[in-house]
Amino acid sequence: MMRQYELVERVQRYKPDVNEALLNKAYVYAMQKHGSQKRASGDPYFSHPLEVAAILTDMHLDEATIAIALLHDTIEDTTATRQEIDQLFGPEIGKLVEGLTKLKKLDLVSKKAVQAENLRKLLLAISEDVRVLLVKLADRLHNMRTLGVMREDKRLRIAEETMDIYAPLAGRMGMQDMREELEELAFRYINPDAWRAVTDRLAELLEKNRGLLQKIETDLSEIFEKNGIKASVKSRQKKPWSVFRKMETKGLSFEQLSDIFGFRVMVDTVQDCYRALGLIHTTWSMVPGRFKDYISTPKQNDYRSIHTTIIGPSRQRIELQIRTREMDEIAEFGVAAHSIYKDRGSANNPHKISTETNAYAWLRQTIEQLSEGDNPEEFLEHTKLELFQDQVFCFTPKGRLIALPRGATPIDFAYAVHTDIGDSCVGAKVNGRIMPLMTELKNGDEVDIIRSKAQVPPAAWESLVATGKARAAIRRATRSAVRKQYSGLGMRILERAFERAGKPFSKDILKPGLPRLARKDVEDVLAAVGRGELPSADVVKAVYPDYQDTRVTTQNNPAKAGEKGWFNIQNAAGMIFKVPEGGEGAAAKVDPAATTPKPGKRALPIRGTNPDLPVRFAPEGAVPGDRIVGILQPGAGITIYPIQSPALTAYDDQPERWIDVRWDIDDQMSERFPARISVSAINSPGSLAEIAQIAAANDANIHNLSMARTAPDFTEMIIDVEVWDLKHLNRIISQLKESASVSSAKRVNG
């Protein structure tokens, strides 16, 4: 423990005229009152108020605040009384110690209403004397540093309260270093596995880049010295919680983070800040969109600094913060360092927050809410809306508060309420109006989720959400839906396979064959067959070892191609496939004599081409809605490709052949456009007709079909269709995927 003279010396370093008598008297009084009391760790209880006092000396606070820290637990935990403290230390210190005692008692209960009342009293106390906040935050910081000795449930409750209230409150009041440490300690107990993983990765990265950081630090210092700027440069690394939060909110992996390292440049004057900025930007390239000037436009908590990001050595992104030394002190200690309580306070109370400054407008507005008699729980939730600048808080129709990262959508909201609600979400009302599911939510929005039992979350939702929980749930639901589809497909294939083999079939019959197939359960077998990973003949043989499959694929034995129940089209690339007429169930026919439909009379709807050059589409086809590019073919005109076509890689080194073209479509457009679809379907009677019927039902023209591969269970085909536009094509592919006969369907590009 810190000795009495050591405490006095710590304060004397920044305040030579310290009132030693006050510190000595508070030290001795608190030590005697706490006596032989022990903390949960077994340490003397007096070590706690002493450590709280030490934290405040690091913030260069006056002796009265240090004395309050030493005394802050005496009324609650010892025989000390308010009257006694008033007599020994004065009524001002006695009032603050008693106020902190009342707040301390409320900390022991986790009910939301009590927590809300705690926050109300804390904010009201801060408005009267900012030292309440300083001692309270230092008290919470030391408790968090020693939280490991507590029961797990109590650790979690205190850590969550710290993350929810105290860390953002410290940030709001400009005390960034304390906010970061509170967040890191809370993160360690709320999600220990993630904390450990991120911490280990950061340590590895720091060791790997130590030399690079030293080089940049040296280069910066030399540049400033040569140009007559007195500056100190210090490298810094993002904290684990900051890294984890960015990974979660932006859906990034650790490897995708590009600004883990940064540098803080401290100079003497504001003019030097801008001179240093100019030197940095003339030495290294800056990253567009990453410059922020908080000197000319300070943050609400009076934070001032210039932020910029450069491309440093090894092409790494490096963030730099440029500020004066006074700005750095305010950024580190916030209200504790700010002149707001040193020389801007009222004459009666130099520690009262001034109502004239703009530095704490948020706190003044919040205190005004208190006088309006808000319900305590409502006040807690509304205050949280303001505490978390990087989060949005929305409400269910019943008033439940849901916290989400900025950029969250109604889909994130639905999954935050419950996974089942997310899985069944088909729409949302935001503040009573039906809004698109991609709508970005704002603070205070009321969100009502519209549900359907038949809904299955589409995979495309993954790109719309901002939370890891929603993303993981969508992936899980998508996998489950796909697995269910493949299982149904596998069931149909196996029913036919066992029927051909003359063997009875049921799910239970498959169980004895699981070890031979190296599958964990029957559903796994069905899905594997449906995906085409496991041939149906192997399953029959696993159940009936004596079974012999006499069939061969049409690839190896073309003579079998005409066998009943199987289909294959020889030289199909030269044939024209006609969509059947006559409605549902009509048969599909192949007409070798048919010809490709003639193009429409209107010229190709492409702008940006030379009218004297012939224009054609690439074999894989581009349709309206695609981004397109033209490639000049010497002696053959211009070929139009969809921008995603792999064939374009052949022209990467020939930029002179690329032509900027675009669609020129009007409502009277009557032409169809060619596109190519790859389909894998069950090799059974009726499958081809079902595929053709889907095309016909969607007003698409199939003008060519070729078999890419035929196997006992599946056949893979390439279908050339003519469609109106990209939406038309996507609708056809979507319905093909939903067909019970189709294993997969996708567009072919190139």
Curated annotation (Swiss-Prot):
Catalysed conversion reaction: GTP + ATP = guanosine 3'-diphosphate 5'-triphosphate + AMP
SUPFAM superfamilies (UniProt xref): ACT-like (SSF55021), HD-domain/PDEase-like (SSF109604), Nucleotidyltransferase (SSF81301), TGS-like (SSF81271)
Ranges where the HD domain occurs: 45-144
Catalytic class of the enzyme: transferase
Keyword set, alphabetical order: ATP-binding, GTP-binding, Kinase, Nucleotide-binding, Transferase
GO biological process: guanosine tetraphosphate metabolic process; response to starvation
Coiled-coil blocks: none
SMART domains documented for this protein: HDc, RelA_SpoT
UniProt GO MF annotations: ATP binding; GTP binding; GTP diphosphokinase activity; guanosine-3',5'-bis(diphosphate) 3'-diphosphatase activity; kinase activity
Region feature (Disordered): 587-613
Gene Ontology cellular-component annotations: plasma membrane
Domain ACT: 676-750
Record-linked Gene3D superfamilies: 3.10.20.30, 3.30.70.260, Beta Polymerase, domain 2, Hypothetical protein af1432
Domain TGS: 390-451
EC number(s) on file: 2.7.6.5
Domain of life: Bacteria
Effect of deleting the gene: Cells show morphological abnormalities such as branching and swelling forms. It does not grow in RPMI-1640 with or without 10% FBS. It shows decreased growth until 48 hours in RPMI-1640 and stationary growth until 48 hours in RPMI-1640 with 10% FBS. It has the same ability as the wild-type to internalize at 0 minute but a lower rate of internalization at 30 minutes. It shows a lower rate of intracellular replication within macrophages than the wild-type. Its adherence is four times higher than that of the wild-type.
Role of this protein: Functions as a (p)ppGpp synthase. In eubacteria ppGpp (guanosine 3'-diphosphate 5'-diphosphate) is a mediator of the stringent response that coordinates a variety of cellular activities in response to changes in nutritional abundance. Plays a role in adaptation of Brucella to its intracellular host environment.
Family: Belongs to the RelA/SpoT family.
NCBIfam families cross-referenced by the UniProt entry: spoT_relA
Name of this chain's protein: GTP pyrophosphokinase rsh
Species annotation: Brucella abortus biovar 1 (strain 9-941)
Lineage, broadest ranks: Bacteria, Pseudomonadati, Pseudomonadota, Alphaproteobacteria, Hyphomicrobiales
